[in-house]
């Protein structure tokens, strides 16, 4: 499939971040976030604020890698209103920094070798803002559909990057079964091939014949399993924010069980 362009991603970062802040402004700070049960609304706004602050530093300092890849947290502020104000200010700085950067320039990311460019941040942060906008809406009881074009891209990103990323120290051995993820409203399908993963991480952890799946081109053969929904519902579902009843799954029972296990892992 054709990915969105950097201008589209930047527009979505702006739009989804604005909706995120506007919705959270209607919530009490202790409102629970159903999709992140350990979080309150205050935790959610602090999280996305920290994420956008972190990636501002990555883009401003490109291509240097961060000293601490997990350093997204910042000291809490005195009030919820202060946190919301800091988010809006942080967001403005992030967007300005990203807009001034050429997507083709080298920049660190936690993803694979092909994603060590500014373009990765454009795309990843559009989806980060989108999914956390949904979290905010769930907390406020004000859920709206995800934009179809961004959600279609989001299904691909979830399957290809979040679930299907392949580190350079690992190897994927393809199996016989293919799964089709079909978006009924955008006439788009994404296929994954099931297989196994093996390798030894830099920390010395050994993986042997772990079930895995990776995005492939349309194989031109019948899939063993079809997962179908609108782009909005499928993207939300892959991120564990959606309703199972809004996703239709048909095909081989054993393949379904395997895919259910693969998609059950946390990608937050």
What is the role of each PLM region?
Residues 39-41:
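Helix-turn-helix
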Residues 9-16, 47, 83-90, 121, ...:
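Amphipathic alpha-helix face/heptad-repeat signature
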Residues 14-26:
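First transmembrane helix
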Residues 1-11, 26-27, 31-37, 60, ...:
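Structured surface interface patches that mediate subunit assembly and partner/cofactor docking
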Residues 1-7, 48-109, 143-155:
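Short, helix-capping/interhelical loops that line the mouth of catalytic, cofactor-
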